[in-house]
Curated annotation (Swiss-Prot):
Heterodimer with SinR. It comes from the Bacteria. This is Protein SinI. Acts as an antagonist to SinR. SinI prevents SinR from binding to its target sequence on the gene for AprE. One of its GO terms (biological process) is regulation of DNA-templated transcription. Residues 2-40 form the Sin domain.
Amino acid sequence: MNKDKNEKEELDEEWTELIKHALEQGISPDDIRIFLNLGKKSSKPSASIERSHSINPF
């Protein structure tokens, strides 16, 4: 468990440094949130999937 705690602390420190550097470069906290959420999968189907179901292949 101590190993897990150390890894979490290291990751927390790394994220803190990354965010600090981003803020120094003029990147807003909202921009950081948007960027981080780009990789998250939504429960909503994408537009291309919705369209593909409406096309009759025959």
